[in-house]
């Protein structure tokens, strides 16, 4: 179970970082 939970947490963190980076690039391009 801990492995699945840690994997899910890692996936969620990666998704958050990717979306944040994408939004940052979009804002930079917008400006």
Swiss-Prot record:
Residues passing through the membrane, by range: 4-26
Membrane topology note: Single-pass membrane protein
InterPro entries from the UniProt entry: Cyt_b6/f_cplx_su6
The protein's name in its UniProt record: Cytochrome b6-f complex subunit 6
GO cellular component assignments: chloroplast thylakoid membrane; cytochrome b6f complex
Places the protein is found: Plastid, Chloroplast thylakoid membrane
PANTHER family xrefs: CYTOCHROME B6-F COMPLEX SUBUNIT 6
Gene Ontology biological process terms in this record: photosynthesis
Predominant localisation class: plastid
Protein family per UniProt: Belongs to the PetL family.
Subunit structure: The 4 large subunits of the cytochrome b6-f complex are cytochrome b6, subunit IV (17 kDa polypeptide, PetD), cytochrome f and the Rieske protein, while the 4 small subunits are PetG, PetL, PetM and PetN. The complex functions as a dimer.
Species the sequence originates in: Daucus carota (Wild carrot)
């Amino acid at each position: 179970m801990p492995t699945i939970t840690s994997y899910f947490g890692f996936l969620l963190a990666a998704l958050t970082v990717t979306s944040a980076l994408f939004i940052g690039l979009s804002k930079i391009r917008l400006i």
